[in-house]
Amino acid sequence: MENQKNDNLNLLEAVVQNTEMGKNTLEQIVPMTDDVQFKAELLRQRNVYHQLNQEAHTAIEACGGIAQGQSAMAKLNTKMGISMKTLTDKSTRNLAEMLTQGSGMGVVDCVKAQKDYPNAAPGAKRLAQRLQEFQEDSRVKLEQFL
């Protein structure tokens, strides 16, 4: 039982960190584009990340835990990385490429977390799977802007 609780909390925390990365990245990139269709897709994705993040927070609290989220250093590294990669090129194509790569990394993180925490409850596993499927779908949608 304790092993399941730990796996639940760890898997849900992985979802929190993954969704925070997506949400924070999109919040930084949205103001950089004037492409109306691209911006609409980014806002849609940001809203889904926010929703999944809230669900993971609620589930962690229901398990008696407290979500940690991304560390300040991880947030800073991401922010600086985006700033460097967009310093000279804020084109839709460049932004879409960066986000496509990020979505791919998010999918890999979801797969690893699900394998690392096999004893998590079905609800936690479903949430992680929904995040993974959303990121796979997002990657495909972003490819149209390359």
Identify the residue ranges that each predicted region occupies.
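Amphipathic alpha-helical hairpins
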Residues: 1-146
